[in-house]
């Protein structure tokens, strides 16, 4: 006889298949031709791949990250791929003054914004909580407060253009997982703030969409290095994740789960939270 956990998992999987069957992908790459995009965390990983996709679709892009030399290389490649315009601005989002400066730069150079894509993250160890409160404060500034500041600064121009805010988050902002205490806290904060803001924008009839992107483990160098030997989950391709994020933002989805099976997993957790099942995906060999 199937156990209750197995029944719920089977039901969640069946629902996901049913939704996939009836959902029709209406994405047209042409709709991003000439779109004005501010993309953060654009120097590596998912952000770099998003930059190349947007360039291929003919967007106008402002790239930002900390490393200027790398941004220059990404900009050059974007131009060869077909971007109509590309600018870059180095910025360290641990500084509270940077978000306003970055948005002003983007608006001045592009004449406005259609998409604000928030993707940057601060480096955080993948380990048990060690009591580093100062690191958590710093991480909240980079991973959360700077997102709030960027979105706040960009809302006026996004509203004029019926634009979109695309927030790259993580399953750790929906389901608390081990080894990610500080990181998970920042992602839960993103979910709470932007989900609440979405309600308020709708109630005020302000035509700005917010797409929250919930990602699993992605095969970026940084993620693979940190999780090696600690997580029993296959990593998904960064280029595919980047494209899924762009499509979700263009479709003005409320939430996007990538890979797709994270959605039934999250639904299962909401219905039947089971810490032991969750912990079975992690390897803890410490004291």
Curated annotation (Swiss-Prot):
NADP(+) binds at residues 41-67, 92-93, 119-121, 183-187, 216-222. It catalyses: cortisone + NADPH + H(+) = cortisol + NADP(+). The active site is at residue 183. Its main location: secreted. Substrate binds at residue 170. It is found in: Secreted. Its EC number is 1.1.1.-. InterPro entries: 11-beta-HSD (IPR051253), NAD(P)-bd_dom_sf (IPR036291), Sc_DH/Rdtase_CS (IPR020904), SDR_fam (IPR002347). GO terms for cellular component: extracellular region; intracellular membrane-bounded organelle. It comes from the Eukaryota. GO terms for molecular function: oxidoreductase activity. Keywords: NADP, Oxidoreductase, Secreted, Signal. Residues 1-20 form the signal peptide. It is an enzyme of class 1 (oxidoreductase). Unidirectional NADP(+)-dependent cortisol dehydrogenase (in vitro). Belongs to the short-chain dehydrogenases/reductases (SDR) family. This is Hydroxysteroid 11-beta-dehydrogenase 1-like protein.
């Amino acid at each position: 006889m199937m156990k209750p956990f197995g029944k719920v998992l089977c039901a969640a999987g069946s629902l996901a298949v049913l939704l996939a069957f009836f959902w029709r992908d209406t994405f047209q790459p042409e709709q991003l031709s000439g779109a004005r995009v501010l993309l953060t965390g654009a120097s590596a990983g998912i952000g770099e791949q998003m930059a190349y996709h947007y360039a291929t679709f003919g967007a106008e892009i402002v790239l930002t990250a900390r490393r200027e030399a790398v941004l220059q290389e990404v900009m050059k490649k974007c131009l060869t791929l077909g971007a109509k315009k590309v600018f870059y601005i180095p910025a360290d989002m641990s500084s509270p003054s940077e978000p306003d400066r970055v948005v002003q730069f983007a608006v001045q150079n592009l004449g406005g914004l259609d998409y604000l894509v928030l993707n940057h993250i601060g480096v955080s160890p993948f380990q048990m909580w060690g009591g580093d409160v100062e690191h958590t404060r710093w991480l909240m500034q980079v991973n959360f407060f700077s997102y709030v500041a960027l979105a706040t600064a960009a809302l006026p121009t996004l509203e004029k253009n019926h634009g979109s805010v695309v927030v790259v988050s993580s399953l750790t902002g929906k389901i608390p997982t081990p080894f990610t205490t500080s990181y998970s806290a920042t992602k839960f904060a993103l979910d709470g703030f932007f989900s609440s803001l979405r309600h308020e924008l709708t109630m005020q009839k302000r035509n700005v969409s917010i797409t929250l992107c919930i990602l699993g483990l992605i095969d970026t160098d940084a993620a693979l290095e940190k999780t090696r030997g600690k997580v029993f989950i296959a990593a998904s391709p960064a280029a595919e994740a980047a494209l899924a994020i762009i499509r979700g933002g263009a479709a003005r989805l409320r939430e996007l789960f990538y890979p797709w099976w994270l959605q039934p997993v999250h639904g299962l957790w909401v219905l039947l939270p089971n810490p032991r099942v969750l912990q079975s995906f992690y390897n803890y060999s410490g004291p």
